Swiss-Prot record:
The lineage of its organism: Bacteria, Pseudomonadati, Pseudomonadota, Gammaproteobacteria, Enterobacterales. This is UPF0181 protein SG1330. It comes from the Bacteria. Residues 58-80 are annotated as: Disordered. Pfam families: UPF0181. Belongs to the UPF0181 family.
Length: 80
């Protein structure tokens, strides 16, 4: 979950994407370009702020218990 994120309009999001693409075209890595644009947005943004939450943040992830292997052709598994 990310707190205090700028609530961007579609147009602002598109401008951010174009800025990231321009930085990458100049040779910057995608991660560095995204980080730089994010810093720029946070530094100059004065509008509404929101909290972002991904579905994984709200789900309880459980691993099913491992089941013992059984032989589907063994009519009486206790006699082994």
């Amino acid at each position: 979950m990310l707190n205090d994120m700028p609530a961007l309009t579609h147009e602002q999001q598109q401008l951010a994407v174009e800025r990231i693409q321009a930085l990458m075209a100049e040779g910057m890595s995608s991660g560095a370009a995204i980080a730089q644009v994010a810093r720029e947005l946070r530094a100059g943004y004065t509008g509404e702020r929101v909290t972002l939450r991904w579905e994984e943040d709200t789900e309880v992830l459980e691993t099913p218990a491992a089941r013992a292997e059984t032989d589907p052709y063994d009519s009486n598994p206790d006699d082994d």
